[in-house]
């Protein structure tokens, strides 16, 4: 992305969130893998936070980015961009508010799978619970605007992202077998910014 021409569309916001969250999940895996430290944090909330930064912060966030990217091609309709960006932001904030306090709880010695805990853990547990509520809103919003877009969304067009891949040269949604005849590719699939010529000849 450095020195690139980046458009902060909803899929890009989810992609950037994926990079950040998955990086935190990966780096905290080093702590879990270090024997001396793992003796202290094993079976604590630190492990819970690490797991969720990898699996939810990584995989689910990437899935949401991909879903937003492909939605126009799948349905032929655009979703409203403003609520989608808001949902991406709410998801990112809610996720970190839910799971980052769990790193601290685990480091301070709170074991997982316990429903009762000493009073000193109360504030961080309340923060984590509040974050889960925010995260739930972030996950529910796409269901609403995706459903809305199926009927009221703007017509997407064949290539709403100005992408250069072959899949964006067919209609949205694509017909059976994508193309009626085999297309002839006339330019590189990653030739962004060179010209505005059509990359295939039908």
Annotate each predicted stretch with a short phrase.
Residues 18-23, 87-100:
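Hydrophobic alpha-helical membrane-insertion segments
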Residues 49-57:
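Membrane-interface loop-to-helix entry segments
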Residues 1-14, 31-47, 62-88, 101-123, ...:
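Juxtamembrane membrane-water interface segments of multi-pass membrane proteins
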């Amino acid at each position: 992305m450095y020195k690139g021409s980046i458009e902060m569309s909803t899929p890009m916001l989810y992609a950037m969130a994926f990079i950040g969250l998955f990086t935190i999940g990966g780096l905290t895996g080093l702590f879990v893998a270090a024997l001396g430290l793992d003796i202290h944090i094993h079976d604590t909330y630190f492990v819970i936070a690490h797991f969720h930064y990898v699996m939810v912060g990584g995989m689910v966030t990437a899935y949401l980015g991909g879903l937003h990217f492909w939605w126009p091609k799948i349905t032929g309709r655009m979703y409203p961009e403003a609520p989608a960006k808001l949902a991406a932001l709410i998801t990112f904030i809610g996720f970190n508010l839910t799971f980052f306090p769990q790193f601290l709880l685990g480091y301070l010695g709170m074991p997982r799978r316990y429903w009762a805990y000493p009073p000193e853990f109360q504030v961080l547990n309340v923060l984590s619970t509040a974050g889960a509520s925010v995260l739930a809103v972030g996950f529910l919003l796409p269901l609403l605007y995706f459903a809305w877009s199926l009927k009221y969304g703007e017509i997407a067009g064949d290539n709403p992202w100005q992408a250069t891949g072959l899949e964006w040269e067919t209609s949205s949604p694509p017909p059976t077998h994508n193309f009626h005849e085999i297309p002839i590719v006339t330019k590189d699939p990653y030739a962004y910014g060179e010209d505005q010529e059509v990359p295939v000849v039908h």
